[in-house]
Each structure stands twice: as structure tokens, then as C-alpha cells.
Amino acid sequence: MSTLEIFAEDGTKLSETTDGGTITGVLAEIGVNFERWPTRGLSADAKGDAILAAYAPEVEWLKARGGYQSIDVVSVAPDHPDRATMRTKFLSEHTHAEDEVRFFVRGEGLFTLHAVGRVWNVLCCEGDLMSVPAGMTHWFDMGAAPNFTAIRMFVNPDGWVAAFTGSDIAERFPRYEPA
């Protein structure tokens, strides 16, 4: 279930909700787009082209709205040989010169935003669209045994390009450990 937890920078939990409308509204206040899309009931073995075809209307709408030029599908399973390296790549606080847009087709992952003196944990699940605005500091944790498929959208054809902040704040907050 999608969850939003808000913390002070010292780690004190300030609030938590699983209500989709509340999550959308609260995140909009800091410039983050969060939406719930209907899922398509794709087979567990559906791959990139089939996934993109199933969500073509939504993807085209987002491309037109955001100017995205590069669209792909990423799938990471618990037995992926590079899962630990992939996880580490995203765990440090960073920014991007463009929005970071992800739609979770399957599974889940934890986006953590660092904005306006707060830390915002957003557990994204199947059917969640998350758009972190350009320049917002954040990190992403897929967990030690990741199991998700997501559609990614980029303006830059080179894809994911991060500028790491050098802050250790991500190390001071719990990692994503699914139940």
C-alpha cells in the first residue's frame, strides 16, 4: 500500500498516511506529482514492449506534457546479479537537471525526498506514478531483494544522470525493508 511518512531532519516522525488523495495533495504542496493509475493486469512475464503498449495512452500523454524523449522499462528481480550495485547507485542523496518520472507497473520501491527542511518517505507501489521535480534532493531504495518493474521517462536521451550532493542524510534514515 502506498505510504507517505514525513520526518524532521533529525529523524522525528511528524506524520504518516496511506490515503492516496492525501498523499497526492501533500506532495503537490512541495511540487511533486503523485498519481494512482489503474493497472492493466499484465502477465507476470510481460516485458518492455508489451508493458509500453499497455500503457501507451498514459505514456503519450506524459510525453506531450513533459517533453520526454526517452522512455524505457526497468525490471529488477531479487535474483538480479547486479541488484546490490544498482541499489547502492541510488541510495545517496542526489538531484537531477530534469524531472525523475517513474510509473510502477509491478512491485514497489521507496523514494525519499529532502525538501523544505523535511524528509518525505514515499513508498510507491503498483499503479503509482511519481514525478520528482528537477533540482529536488532525493534518493531511492529498491531494497536488498528488489522486485519491481517501472516505466521511466527522460527528457535527456542519455537517461538517468545524477548530481550527488555529498550529504550523508540518506545514511541517517532507515533503508527500505519490505515486510
Where are each of the predicted segments found?
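Conserved short histidine dyad/triad with adjacent acidic residue
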Residues: V73-A97
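Structural signal for conserved beta-strand scaffold positions within catalytic alpha/beta enzyme cores
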Residues: I6, R36, D72-S75, R152
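Double-stranded beta-helix
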Residues: G143-A179
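A short secondary-structure junction signal
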Residues: L113-V116, N121-L123, M142-G143, A162-F164
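Conserved metal-binding segment of the jelly-roll/cupin
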Residues: C124-A144
